[in-house]
Amino acid sequence: MSSIDKKELEKFEKISHNWWNKDGDFGILHCINPIRLEYIIEKITSHYNDISKLEILDVGCGGGLIATPLAAQGFNVTAIDALQSNIETATAYAKENGVKINYLQSTIEELKSNKLYDVVICLEVIEHVENVQQFILNLVQHIKPNGIAIISTINRMKKAYILGIIVAEYILGWVPKNTHNYSKFLKPSEIYEMLTDTGIEIKELKGLIYDMAKNEWKLSDNIEVNYFMYLERNTH
């Protein structure tokens, strides 16, 4: 069962050349990227005593906004995306900046099922896929025993519709119009149900909010709009 939403792919295909333009279609991701990286690295270093040989998988990597900086810091990163044009953009940027990383054009379904990783990352992806439950199950099956995963997405709440779609897309123009579909947003409780009997435990939920007074993004306990989900797999 494929997780590919062809309409979503077509949408991102048109702007796949623009990933590293901080003033372009993905400008908002550049704004939140330092916080995303800081959160991911904090979770990795808190969970593992020795990070020198860790293998990281970034699913739906886009142009490599997370994968390339992680690899630049010495992590062993494999990053996959369904769009070949995204992989070409990511590969070119990494090469230009002397970063060693393994970029692959692949869906999570096409990835070898017996290959496990210490860390699995999937940021701002699950709200763009079909068959989301199967996608998430395929995602977590690649986590090693005692491994971790970090997912980020948007909550399906009224506030998320107002801020994530009306304000972000139509008023402020932070992202292109029609980037998001409210019906595809997921509540944490829904992901929790999908993970039942998988041996995966949700250890933390952390919100990401925009502080208008300070004109900055920051982590928060408010998960009404954007949120991170930190997962751990048991040792069995």
UniProtKB/Swiss-Prot annotation:
It catalyses: a 3-demethylubiquinol + S-adenosyl-L-methionine = a ubiquinol + S-adenosyl-L-homocysteine + H(+); a 3-(all-trans-polyprenyl)benzene-1,2-diol + S-adenosyl-L-methionine = a 2-methoxy-6-(all-trans-polyprenyl)phenol + S-adenosyl-L-homocysteine + H(+). One of its GO terms (biological process) is methylation. Its EC number is 2.1.1.222, 2.1.1.64. InterPro entries: SAM-dependent_MTases_sf, UbiG_MeTrfase. It comes from the Bacteria. Pathway: Cofactor biosynthesis; ubiquinone biosynthesis. SUPFAM superfamilies: S-adenosyl-L-methionine-dependent methyltransferases (SSF53335). S-adenosyl-L-methionine binds at R36, G60, D81, L123. Disulfide bonds: none annotated. O-methyltransferase that catalyzes the 2 O-methylation steps in the ubiquinone biosynthetic pathway. HAMAP family: UbiG. PANTHER family: METHYLTRANSFERASE, UBIQUINONE BIOSYNTHESIS O-METHYLTRANSFERASE, MITOCHONDRIAL. This is Ubiquinone biosynthesis O-methyltransferase.
